[in-house]
Structures are given as structure tokens and as C-alpha cells.
């Protein structure tokens, strides 16, 4: 990814066929991309769901719920749009083909949204690890531990330990000097 912020997209809902599929677009061209698929400006306040028709040229993709998140209120710290479509394979494939046709947008790789959040200061490293553990948790105990990391409490604990160790170090150095 380098230093340039890219616009990325991915299916954010679970794998397989379902009633609803959520596709997330995040980056500087997210709003421009959705406006092109809508054939007009979204004109929706952030964090409100609106029902709109998506188009790829003259082909109707689907009627979908669209939610826009401004940079300051998104998970990634980038402009983000969530598209809630019907979950059929045909609709998902057609929508992905449409998104792939844009020049300044690419499919997200594993962890790309989290990387955006880390780079934008929305998450720290321990929260990133906690999120990965939360996503992969198979037991209740794993989930509880992952929640603690993800909540950021671990970072506060480490900072407290660091502060105490620095005080101990200073006291030892002072006692050696005298």
C-alpha cells in the first residue's frame, strides 16, 4: 500500500449464500464510487440508511441499502460506504465486476480495512491483535480475552507497567549514584 491511501472494497458479511450481503468500500474514492453506481449523488447524512438503486451502465444491479460513514465516524478513519444488497451470487458477482471496473479502487486483501484503521490512529497494535483474535475466537474464553485486547485496556496496563518500571529504573540508578 505504501504511503498513498487507496480505496478498497470487500464483502464484509459472511461467506456463502444469504439473504443480505454487505460490501464495504473504504478510502478517498468511496463516495465518488457509490455516486457513480447510483447515477447521482448519495445526498444522505452520515450513518443513515437509504434505499437506492445501483446501476452499472444501463444494467440494474440491485436495490440496496446504502450507509455512508464520514472519515471521523468510520472504523477505518477513511470515507466508507456500506452497500447492503440481496445476497444472491449473481448480484454479488455483478456488483464486484462493476467495482473492479473503476480505476482508483481495488479489492481489499485480508486485513486491509484494519490496516487503514491502524494507519489512521483508529486502532493501536494491541487492538489490531485483539480484533484478529476476536474474529478467530472459537471458545467463550478466547472471546473474552480477545475483547480485553480489542477494548484497549491491555495498552493501558502495559503503559502502567512501563511507567512503574521506569520509576524502578530511576530509583536504582539514583541509589547507585549515591
Q: What are the roles of these predicted feature ranges?
A:
Residues 1-144, 148, 152:
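A glycine-rich (often HGG/GG-containing) alpha/beta subdomain
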Residues 140-178:
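Flexible nucleotide-interacting loop at or near the entrance of a catalytic core
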